[in-house]
Amino acid sequence: MKRFVTIKSLILVFALLLAIIPVSATERPFASNGNGVAAFIRDDAGNVVGANLTLSGHGTHLGLFSGTGKIQFLPDANDPNISHPAGEITYVAANGDRLPTVIEDGRMDLGTGIATGYMVFQSGTGRFEGVSGRAAIVVEQNFITGAYTFTLVGNINY
């Protein structure tokens, strides 16, 4: 009888230990697409130096989302037709969970309005707390209206 109680106690301790071990983040495929409007920011000389963004779309792990952001356009020292967007964008899922991102390796062709780069996921709220990963982004910008479309493909860890 005493041996049976000891075995039950060991099983209980083992089960409790398993329950407190943190679950590691899982890498998952991520894809989204959407559209938005850029409200361009100009310097005193009238040059576009940045933009305030509003956006919406649909993405894996986000569902329908909205978002806002602010970017700066950094000129390329070697090519006046190229700009390097830098900044932050926060995606907000329909349930309110927030997924902040930072632009990395941004490159925009000012002749075509096509931009590429990476969105690096930052720790957010809700299910995106402690998130990591990144997704390649392609943006097609209309410089006259400020409208743009975008597509992201990559991996997210949470």
Description of each model-found segment:
Residues 6, 22-25:
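Short, low-complexity disordered leader/linker segments with a strong preference
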Residues 24-158:
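Beta-strand-enriched cores of mature, soluble protein domains
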Residues 9-19:
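Bacterial N-terminal signal peptides
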Residues 1-9:
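Positively charged n-region of N-terminal signal peptides that target proteins for export
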